[in-house]
From Swiss-Prot:
Subcellular location: Cytoplasm
Organism: Saccharomyces cerevisiae (strain ATCC 204508 / S288c)
Keyword Aminoacyl-tRNA synthetase: no
Function of the molecule: Stimulates specifically the GTPase activity of YPT6.
Gene Ontology CC terms: cytoplasm; cytosol; endosome; trans-Golgi network
Note: Present with 2990 molecules/cell in log phase SD medium.
One example GO MF annotation: GTPase activator activity
Gene: GYP6
Domain Rab-GAP TBC stretches: 33-316
Keywords for this protein: Cytoplasm, GTPase activation, Phosphoprotein
Annotated InterPro entries: Rab-GAP-TBC_dom, Rab-GAP_TBC_sf
Sequence segments annotated as region (Disordered): 116-136
Protein name in UniProt: GTPase-activating protein GYP6
SMART domains recorded: TBC (SM00164)
Length: 458
């Protein structure tokens, strides 16, 4: 870690330089500069510097331990204890230190039955129908909450260290303290929290148990990340609204052909003639639950999950937009498989969406056959495409968003979408300035892909 720390100090004076050059331009990932055990340092640099983003890396994090008062121990509950929220009056105030910010909103704990059937399960049948309003759910007691946490922690398969009793106890304490931080919002534990926390814990773990300072830093990083993802993706109503308000719109702009065949189809009238208005026939939520709540932990190899999280933790873009654009980019990476599926002759007539959902829920297996899963440079290119889509979305440059995707598909897979074909037939009528911009965008994507192909062939 000292090597990458010294390299970063020599190259970046501020957090902003680390973000823009080191992460978004990919400098940290070149020439094996970035070691596997350096990510804990990087995440502390991103999240433990001051709010003005002018933290000097040469400070070496001295004095940046925001939660100075330690963690609250998990209560020992004897048989028959009826511990409820009234006992929280005796909780030491140190865990509610003002520097550990919280979000606003009321969440409900996943019901007991969700321990056996929750939406993050790999089982597709279990995932269907998993969304519930949550308004009628009865909040669980502390004992029930800790029992679910213990069960979830025992199932973590990210690394063998999570089977060690001391690590289990520390993870349990971290989750308990996270819930205490947000006790005024009535936030309660849900499946998925433990998996997000396990990734962060693992990055600060270097072969020995975490000391109290490390545990506090894990909690701060976890809390800041969850402040962004929990209100949107762990709240069923907000997730549905995000799908309609953000994801569906971006999906339709970037991949209109795929979108129309998978989710929207023109209904037929009684006479067999089609109406003019399309209608939504399938929901994205069956698979979006897992993709969003776990931030791609089940969809990508861990080393690429960590790269995505590096970009997430820069918070260059609001998380709801960044996640939507990341999903689109990942779908672009397997567009050939998706295109083959929806191009079947009878797909529109027999489409019940099962095949598409099955393919998406096995995304990791398909992705691992693609070049981007074997070449860090190509995966970093996908991250840059995500950033470009975010920028264009904010600028309302929807045509350029589609152009980037069409060009990527054409250059990588040789598939010409309807938009590429229509542009080729309309070249004479396109404004010259517009044509110049489109050519530059198309050439940039083409050169990037050709450069990566040359590297592989050498």
């Amino acid at each position: 870690m000292k090597d990458v720390l010294q390299w970063a100090i020599d190259h970046y004076e501020t957090r902003d330089q680390l973000v823009q050059k080191g992460i978004w331009k990919g400098e940290l990932y070149h020439d094996s500069i970035f070691k596997e055990n350096s990510r804990g340092w990087l995440w502390k640099a991103l999240l433990l510097c001051d709010e003005n983003n002018n933290c000097l890396l040469t400070d070496n994090f001295k004095g940046l331990d925001l939660n100075q008062f330690g963690l609250v121990p998990v209560p020992m509950l004897a048989d028959g204890d009826n511990y409820d929220e009234n006992h929280n009056a005796n909780v030491p105030k140190r865990v509610l230190h003002s520097n550990v910010s919280s979000s606003v909103g009321i969440r409900r704990l996943t019901p007991v039955e969700a321990v056996e059937k929750h939406p993050l399960s790999d089982d597709n049948d279990k995932t269907k129908g998993s969304l519930s309003k949550g308004s009628d759910e009865k909040p669980l007691t502390l004992r029930e909450t800790l029992e679910i946490i213990d069960l979830d922690l025992s199932r973590i398969m990210l690394d063998d260290i999570f089977q060690e009793p001391k690590v289990h106890a520390q993870m349990r304490q971290l989750l308990y303290n996270y819930l205490l931080i947000h006790q005024s919002e009535h936030l309660q534990y849900k499946q998925g929290f433990h998996e997000i926390l396990s990734v962060i814990y693992l990055q600060l773990y270097h072969g020995t148990d975490l000391d109290n300072t490390d545990l506090q830093n894990v909690l701060i990083i976890f809390n800041k990340l969850m402040n962004q993802i929990e209100p949107i993706f762990y709240n069923e109503e907000n997730l549905i609204n995000w799908d309609k308000r953000v994801f569906t719109k971006i999906f339709r702009i970037c991949l209109p052909d795929l979108f129309s065949k998978v989710f929207y189809q023109p209904p037929k009238t009684g006479s067999g003639k089609k109406k003019n208005v399309d209608h939504l026939i399938h929901s994205n939520l069956i698979w979006l639950i897992r993709w969003t709540r776990l931030l791609f932990l089940r969809e990508l190899p861990l080393k690429y999950v960590l790269i995505v999280w590096d970009h997430v933790l820069t918070f260059n873009y609001p998380l709801d937009i960044f996640i939507a654009c990341t999903i689109i980019t990942l779908l672009l990476s397997i567009y050939d498989e998706l295109h083959e599926l929806v191009s079947q002759g009878d797909y529109e007539h027999t489409n019940n969406n099962d095949e598409f959902v099955e393919l998406i829920l096995h995304f990791k297996k398909i992705f691992e056959k693609e070049d981007a899963s074997k070449d860090d440079e190509k995966f970093l290119d996908l991250c840059k495409v995500t950033g470009n889509l975010c920028e264009l979305w904010y600028g309302k440059n929807y045509d350029d968003m589609r152009l980037i995707c069409d060009t990527f598909i054409n250059a990588k897979f040789g598939i010409k979408t309807s938009d590429v074909l229509s542009m080729e037939t309309a070249k004479l009528t396109i404004d010259p300035n517009r044509q110049s911009l489109e050519n530059k965008l198309r050439e940039r994507v083409r050169q990037t892909i050709l450069k990566n192909k040359k590297k592989i062939s050498q």
